[in-house]
Amino acid sequence: MKKHIITILVFTTGLNLFSQSNIENQIFDIGIESIDSFREFLSIKNDANFKNEMKPLIEWGINNFKKYGFEVERLETPELPLLLASKVISEDLNTLLIYLQFDGQPVDNSKWDQENPYKAVLKERINDEYKITDWGKLDNLTFDDIKKDDLRIFARSASDAKGPVMMILNALEIMKRNNIELEYNLKVIMDFEEEISSPNLADAVKKYSSKLKSDALLIFDGPKHPSNLPTLTFGARGISDITLITYGPI
């Protein structure tokens, strides 16, 4: 069952302008403010096996990156498009490309201890079990309170991988409120078919290579370190498989 600890990642560029405590307070406040938006995001179906249901998710991606001054274009493929959001500060600056995944694993309602996997619920840990609690419990809490009660949001893709999308948007919101300017160009590629092995991604990268051209790539996905600290992983393994054919009685 997917769960998302209420925590927000913020870009570090320009944070030296503010005290650490001020930034931490803003991260928490904006994280709480964004809960309703996150719940709305989680309510949008994102199973790439049902392509006719993915349009609202694609529109959500377009609208939410446009709010932060990005130019967003569809990179068409034979099936679902990719989205490319670009914010070019200067052609003389380096460019960072961020990869985000929007789709999620198929849903088996029978395995979820809640009304609907696409209807997010807040749970707290009681005697080693997570029990549904009221969203109002988040009112007037500190981050230490949330950690103490082990409050978590349960919904399909709350962690894998709508959580990282919301983290990026909240980071952009903090930068906007504090008038922090990017010191590099930023591009974001949004994949709506990752959980079905991104069948069109490789060809799209070749076809749109000039649009995707960047100096560095950050894949905003994957598990955190067991310490629960923010993690940067330098390099990623690929995947391989074998087909084993047996003959005779088993």
Model-flagged regions — what are they?
Residues 15-19:
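Sec/Tat signal peptide C-region and signal peptidase I cleavage site
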